[in-house]
């Protein structure tokens, strides 16, 4: 049991919450340049070729970012925006690429959930 004198000398310290997305440094998004665009396979029991890219951010961090949606136009030296959000079946992938901003195009022929994939509303 701690005495009051001990608490006066050294107060209780708060636990510091560890960020899930340290490379963003508290920002909602960060800009970066693709250094490598490739596919990788998920953990068991899933099976696919997930599209990911290695990104060098403006703050010097180098992170792996997932490219969502069907098809993309990214290649080396593309400038993209990333947001937080991990991919559960890809170890080490803690960021998502934002579609429809900077050099990353929106998903072609997307009709539903368009805002998540950078697609404008179609004219009737």
Curated annotation (Swiss-Prot):
GO MF terms, alphabetically ordered: rRNA binding; structural constituent of ribosome; tRNA binding
Keyword hit for Cell cycle: no
Residues found modified as 3-methylthioaspartic acid: 89
Pfam families: Ribosom_S12_S23
InterPro entries: NA-bd_OB-fold, Ribosomal_uS12, Ribosomal_uS12_bac
One BP term from GO: translation
UniProt KW keywords: Methylation, Ribonucleoprotein, Ribosomal protein, RNA-binding, rRNA-binding, tRNA-binding
Gene Ontology cellular component terms for the protein in this record: small ribosomal subunit
NCBIfam families according to UniProt: rpsL_bact (TIGR00981)
Family according to the record: Belongs to the universal ribosomal protein uS12 family.
Function: With S4 and S5 plays an important role in translational accuracy. Interacts with and stabilizes bases of the 16S rRNA that are involved in tRNA selection in the A site and with the mRNA backbone. Located at the interface of the 30S and 50S subunits, it traverses the body of the 30S subunit contacting proteins on the other side and probably holding the rRNA structure together. The combined cluster of proteins S8, S12 and S17 appears to hold together the shoulder and platform of the 30S subunit.
Identification of the protein by name: Small ribosomal subunit protein uS12
Source organism: Baumannia cicadellinicola subsp. Homalodisca coagulata
Gene name linked to the record: rpsL
């Amino acid at each position: 049991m701690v005495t009051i004198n001990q608490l006066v000398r050294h107060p209780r310290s708060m636990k510091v919450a560890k960020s899930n997305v340290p490379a963003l440094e508290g920002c909602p998004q960060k800009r970066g340049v693709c250094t490598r665009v490739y596919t990788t396979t998920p953990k068991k029991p899933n099976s696919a070729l997930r599209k990911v890219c290695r990104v060098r951010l403006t703050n010097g961090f180098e992170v792996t970012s997932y490219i969502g949606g069907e098809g993309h136009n990214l290649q080396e030296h593309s400038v993209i925006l990333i947001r937080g959000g991990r991919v559960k079946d890809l170890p080490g992938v803690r960021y998502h690429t934002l579609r429809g901003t900077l050099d990353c195009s929106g998903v072609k022929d997307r009709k539903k959930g368009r805002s998540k994939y950078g697609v404008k509303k179609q004219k009737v």
